[in-house]
């Protein structure tokens, strides 16, 4: 099997993955699927159905939860592929999953950039606070990002095929890790610039201005609760970008510029795991932003504690009854 490197020269293509990687992928994706599915369904329901006063942040959060859910729903197919070492779902569905692997981090970073800009407006430009309630602009921004991202990822369905599609059993190498997404340089260079560097610079610019204003006391008119909430959101976004998205894109850039053999790359696999982890870390954002989401999480925790206490009471009462029965029989 061969594929093409950056100079369009044939190089060996090795699709094998270590057994340790497959086991780790199955365990990791299972945890991500269970946690992420519960968290994001709850968040989408809270933001879309139970939130009375919607703001621009809640609009962005609805889109984050929706994107997370779309990506999470692809994980069972990945797990099946790693468990069975074959792909029975066809070439077209493999291409769709490969495109979604590119689609998720691209749109997620822009949504995080929108949230950062929103917090910039809340802290640095409080006189424009009314704009934060203008959900129409937020909806238009989200629709624009969805269209833009779909437009750039759709060509991945058509431009290149799985180099091992005719093998038996069938494979789907594009969903394995990011090394199989580097074949089209122009498209990937655009992706790296427009869907990583630009939103990253927007976030960094917003954070620097916000920190400068906080240090120089130019936010005295801002309510302490609003300031504290905004700082928490900023710290959460910064940690999420640094941990989940930056290693993934740095590794992707090195792989894209490299000319070596296309084979299993442990750093590519590890950074892909980190990128997938962001679907669960969004729960911190949901918890900070929405009081309704906080209430749902607390109610679930209290309900679990209630069930545990009831089980303990029933166990104790059952033990006391059995002791009384034994005593009566002895008498």
From Swiss-Prot:
<feature type="transmembrane region" description="Helical; Name=7">
    <location>
        <begin position="269"/>
        <end position="289"/>
    </location>
</feature>
<dbReference type="GO" id="GO:0002305">
    <property type="term" value="P:CD8-positive, gamma-delta intraepithelial T cell differentiation"/>
</dbReference>
<feature type="topological domain" description="Extracellular">
    <location>
        <begin position="160"/>
        <end position="191"/>
    </location>
</feature>
<keyword id="KW-0472">Membrane</keyword>
<keyword id="KW-0968">Cytoplasmic vesicle</keyword>
<keyword id="KW-0675">Receptor</keyword>
<feature type="topological domain" description="Cytoplasmic">
    <location>
        <begin position="48"/>
        <end position="56"/>
    </location>
</feature>
<dbReference type="GO" id="GO:0002689">
    <property type="term" value="P:negative regulation of leukocyte chemotaxis"/>
</dbReference>
<feature type="topological domain" description="Extracellular">
    <location>
        <begin position="78"/>
        <end position="95"/>
    </location>
</feature>
<dbReference type="GO" id="GO:0002300">
    <property type="term" value="P:CD8-positive, alpha-beta intraepithelial T cell differentiation"/>
</dbReference>
<feature type="modified residue" description="Phosphoserine">
    <location>
        <position position="322"/>
    </location>
</feature>
<keyword id="KW-1003">Cell membrane</keyword>
<feature type="topological domain" description="Extracellular">
    <location>
        <begin position="1"/>
        <end position="26"/>
    </location>
</feature>
<dbReference type="GO" id="GO:0007186">
    <property type="term" value="P:G protein-coupled receptor signaling pathway"/>
</dbReference>
<protein>
    <recommendedName>
        <fullName>N-arachidonyl glycine receptor</fullName>
    </recommendedName>
</protein>
<dbReference type="InterPro" id="IPR028335">
    <property type="entry name" value="GPR18"/>
</dbReference>
<feature type="transmembrane region" description="Helical; Name=1">
    <location>
        <begin position="27"/>
        <end position="47"/>
    </location>
</feature>
<dbReference type="GO" id="GO:0032720">
    <property type="term" value="P:negative regulation of tumor necrosis factor production"/>
</dbReference>
<dbReference type="InterPro" id="IPR000276">
    <property type="entry name" value="GPCR_Rhodpsn"/>
</dbReference>
<keyword id="KW-0812">Transmembrane</keyword>
<keyword id="KW-0297">G-protein coupled receptor</keyword>
<feature type="transmembrane region" description="Helical; Name=5">
    <location>
        <begin position="192"/>
        <end position="212"/>
    </location>
</feature>
<keyword id="KW-1015">Disulfide bond</keyword>
<keyword id="KW-0325">Glycoprotein</keyword>
<feature type="topological domain" description="Cytoplasmic">
    <location>
        <begin position="117"/>
        <end position="138"/>
    </location>
</feature>
<keyword id="KW-0597">Phosphoprotein</keyword>
<feature type="topological domain" description="Cytoplasmic">
    <location>
        <begin position="290"/>
        <end position="331"/>
    </location>
</feature>
<feature type="transmembrane region" description="Helical; Name=4">
    <location>
        <begin position="139"/>
        <end position="159"/>
    </location>
</feature>
<feature type="glycosylation site" description="N-linked (GlcNAc...) asparagine">
    <location>
        <position position="14"/>
    </location>
</feature>
<feature type="transmembrane region" description="Helical; Name=2">
    <location>
        <begin position="57"/>
        <end position="77"/>
    </location>
</feature>
<dbReference type="Pfam" id="PF00001">
    <property type="entry name" value="7tm_1"/>
</dbReference>
<feature type="disulfide bond">
    <location>
        <begin position="94"/>
        <end position="172"/>
    </location>
</feature>
<dbReference type="InterPro" id="IPR017452">
    <property type="entry name" value="GPCR_Rhodpsn_7TM"/>
</dbReference>
<comment type="function">
    <text>G protein-coupled receptor (GPCR) that plays a role in diverse physiological processes particularly within the immune and nervous systems. Becomes active when triggered by various endogenous ligands including endocannabinoid N-arachidonyl glycine (NAGly), delta-9-tetrahydrocannabinol or resolvin D2/RvD2 derived from the omega-3 fatty acid docosahexaenoic acid (DHA). Upon RvD2 binding, facilitates the resolution of inflammation, aiding in tissue repair and homeostasis.</text>
</comment>
<feature type="transmembrane region" description="Helical; Name=3">
    <location>
        <begin position="96"/>
        <end position="116"/>
    </location>
</feature>
<keyword id="KW-1133">Transmembrane helix</keyword>
<dbReference type="GO" id="GO:0004930">
    <property type="term" value="F:G protein-coupled receptor activity"/>
</dbReference>
<comment type="similarity">
    <text>Belongs to the G-protein coupled receptor 1 family.</text>
</comment>
<keyword id="KW-0807">Transducer</keyword>
<feature type="transmembrane region" description="Helical; Name=6">
    <location>
        <begin position="233"/>
        <end position="253"/>
    </location>
</feature>
<dbReference type="GO" id="GO:0016020">
    <property type="term" value="C:membrane"/>
</dbReference>
<dbReference type="GO" id="GO:0005886">
    <property type="term" value="C:plasma membrane"/>
</dbReference>
């Amino acid at each position: 099997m061969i594929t093409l490197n950056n100079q369009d020269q044939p190089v060996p293509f090795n699709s094998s993955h270590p057994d340790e990687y497959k086991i780790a992928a199955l365990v990791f994706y299972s945890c991500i699927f269970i946690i992420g599915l519960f968290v994001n369904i709850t968040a989408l329901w809270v933001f879309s159905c139970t939130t009375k006063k919607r703001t621009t942040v809640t609009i962005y959060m609805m889109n984050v939860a929706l994107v997370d859910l779309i990506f999470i729903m692809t994980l069972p197919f990945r797990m099946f592929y790693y468990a069975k070492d074959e792909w029975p779902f066809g070439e077209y569905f493999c291409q769709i999953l490969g495109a979604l692997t590119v689609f998720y981090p691209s749109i997620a970073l822009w949504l995080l950039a929108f949230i950062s800009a929103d917090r910039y407006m809340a802290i640095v430009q409080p006189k424009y606070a009314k704009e934060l309630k203008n959900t129409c602009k937020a909806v238009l921004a989200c629709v624009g990002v969805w269209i833009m991202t779909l437009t750039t990822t759709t060509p991945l369905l058509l431009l290149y095929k799985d180099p091992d599609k005719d093998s038996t059993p069938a494979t789907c190498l594009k969903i394995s890790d990011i090394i199989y997404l580097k074949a089209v340089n122009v498209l990937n260079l655009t992706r790296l610039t427009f869907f990583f560097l630009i939103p990253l610079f927007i976030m960094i610019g917003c954070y620097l201005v916000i920190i400068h204003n906080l240090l120089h006391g130019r936010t005295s008119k801002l309510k302490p609760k609003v300031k504290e909430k905004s700082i928490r959101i900023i710290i959460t976004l910064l940690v999420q970008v640094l941990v989940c998205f930056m290693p993934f894109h740095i590794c992707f850039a090195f792989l894209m510029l490299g000319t070596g053999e296309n084979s299993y790359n442990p750093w590519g696999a590890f950074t892909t795991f980190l990128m997938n982890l962001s679907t669960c870390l969004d729960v911190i954002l949901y918890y900070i932003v929405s009081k309704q989401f906080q209430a749902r999480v607390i109610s679930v925790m209290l309900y679990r504690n209630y069930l545990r206490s009831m089980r303990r009471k029933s166990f104790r009462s059952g033990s006391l009854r059995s002791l009384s029965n034994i005593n009566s029989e002895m008498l």
